[in-house]
């Protein structure tokens, strides 16, 4: 099957690696009843500022936030809680490292969720060249120019705005 961390990326409509932002993904968990080696602690991994995906940590969000901040992430680093990724009752809760616990509490999420942390969740970055339709690689030619892509996105925005206006009437 597909791991829930991949399903979470789809739910977030996010790429876990982006040029100039993060080229690594750390998949880990908080220490709980089963410890983790100190060299693999959340605090240790946080020093890298890579995208981090955490399993089995939803019940420890206060401690998780503290470990992430002490390790090097700022309180306002983008984060997300993805409850039951890929399930019909999936919920995506966007927040920051500093508001993880409050966000989960307000949504009544106590387990069965992944935590994703990193600047890749900001959403304002250039997409990966691998998926950029204006980028030619050894295996494919660019499918459009940057100008054409800009026009396409502008048209899509106009269509979405018109659709939303039609639904609100």
Predicted regions and their residues:
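Short glycine-cluster motifs
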Residues: 1-31
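A contiguous loop/helix-start segment that scaffolds small-molecule binding in enzyme catalytic cores
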Residues: 22-24, 32-150, 169
């Amino acid at each position: 099957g597909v791991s829930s961390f991949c399903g979470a990326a789809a739910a977030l409509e996010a790429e876990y690696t982006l040029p100039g932002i993060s080229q690594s993904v750390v998949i880990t968990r908080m220490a709980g009843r089963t410890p983790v080696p100190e060299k693999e602690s959340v605090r240790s991994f946080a020093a890298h500022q890579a995208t981090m995906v955490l399993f089995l940590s939803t019940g420890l969000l206060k401690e998780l936030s503290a470990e992430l901040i002490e390790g090097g992430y700022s309180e306002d680093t983008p984060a997300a809680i993805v409850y039951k990724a890929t399930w019909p009752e999936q919920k995506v809760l966007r927040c920051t490292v500093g508001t993880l616990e409050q966000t989960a509490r307000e949504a009544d999420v106590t387990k069965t969720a992944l935590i994703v942390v990193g600047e890749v969740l900001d959403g304002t970055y250039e997409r990966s060249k691998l998926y950029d339709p204006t980028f030619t690689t050894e295996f494919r030619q660019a499918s459009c120019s940057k100008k054409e892509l800009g026009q396409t996105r502008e048209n899509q925005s106009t269509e979405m705005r018109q659709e939303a206006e039609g639904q609100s009437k």
